[in-house]
Structures are given as structure tokens and as C-alpha cells.
Amino acid sequence: MEASDGQADEREEPLEQGTNARSLERRSSTTPAKDSLVRHAKGLDRDTFKICKEYLRPLKKFLRKLHLPKDLPQKKKLKYMKQSLVVLGDHINTFLQHYCRAWEIKHWKKMLWRFVSLFSELEAKQLRKLYKYTKNNQTTKFLMAFCPLDAPESSLLADQEDSLPKLCTAWGLRSHLNGMKERLSKLQAPGHPARLLKELRARGPRRRGSKLPQEPKLKRRRIKEAPDTPETCL
């Protein structure tokens, strides 16, 4: 119990003055940060930069995957981006829990994500949002935030055609396979995903309690019965 209490006290020390922060600075002093990165690190002084660099050093592989070749398929980009953000975001949260006091959390969260953004074309706020969407399984919001409007996402749908025959057979819809393939090809047409994203952005989130527009009710017309003619009476 005494050992665990000691560890808890150690974790509660403020980062700027705590022993953990000083040890991080001492270890990072042996490997000075590259001037090119420091120059682009707006709001990060050298000491803060060294602390962030030292703490995230074990995750170099995931930092590199935030900036992937442009010719890489979109599906793989999404996969690597999600994996990297989950690992990096969880690591940052661990840092905030174990090394920061309550009043320091906001500052160091901002600094650590700003350091991560140096390895990506996206800003720190965007990366934090993508991490949040990934953790909450909000795929639609993730795609809207990550995929640019002019980038067709046909590669994300390409593998769906392979699974169509199996699905149709399992559900007894073999005769509808051609029709489903035709609809899928329309979805994969150039510009179609971009148009869908534009429509989603234009609509925006629907407020709670808001009702969907209803079609005007048509007035029922009373049909007057025709008077009986002499022929019908016979």
C-alpha cells in the first residue's frame, strides 16, 4: 500500500516542476530536437517540444503514418490514419492522467496534439476531432472531416462488389444481383461521393424536436351519385 501511495503522489506532481518532467527533459537533452520541426511548432517552446518529443518517441511508427504517400489507396489511408490516431490519442490521454493536475490537462492536451500535427497535413484540432470520431465509431463524421470534397471515394466501395454474390446467395436474392451491381456502379461513378458529402454538409445536423416536412393533405372530394335514369330503373 505504501508503494502505491508513493506512486500516486509522484503522478500528481505538476509537470513543469515535477520529477517526471525533469527526467524527461534530461533524457531528451541528449537528443536535441531538429531545428526544422521547432521552427514550425507554433506555440511550442523548446522545453515543451522536448517533453512532447521524449514522451511520444516510442510511437514514431504511428507518427509517420499520419503522412502517407498520395498514391496510396484511400482505404489504406483511412485504415492507417484510424490506427495511428487511436494509439497516439490513447497515449496522450495516459500522459494527461498520470503526469498532469486538473488545471494542467487542457494546456498539455493542446501542446501534445500540436506536436502530433507536425507530422500531418491536418491541424491539431482536426486530428483531435478525428480521434474522437474514431473512438466513438462515428464513421460518417470521420469521412466528412477527413476526405476532401474533390476526392472520389470509389476505392472505399470497390471491395463491396466482391461480396455481393455471397450476400445475394445467402439472402435468396440471386436474381437481383445484376440490379444491385448496376446501382453499385452508379455509386462508384466519379463525383458521386463528393455530391453526397456536399448534400450532407448542406443539410447539417437536424435539431431535436424538429419535424420532417409533411406533404400537404389532399382534400377528399365527395363524389356525387348520379341520379337514377329511367333506363336503370327498368
Curated annotation (Swiss-Prot):
Region (CHD1 helical C-terminal domain (CHCT)) location: 44-145
Region (Disordered): 1-38, 200-234
GO cellular component: cytoplasm; nucleus
Location of this chain's protein in the cell: Cytoplasm; Nucleus
Signal peptide: none
Superkingdom: Eukaryota
Keywords: Cytoplasm, Nucleus
Entry note about domains: The CHD1 helical C-terminal domain (CHCT) may bind DNA and nucleosomes.
Protein role: May play a role in regulation of apoptosis.
Full protein name: CHD1 helical C-terminal domain containing protein 1
Gene responsible for this protein: CHCT1
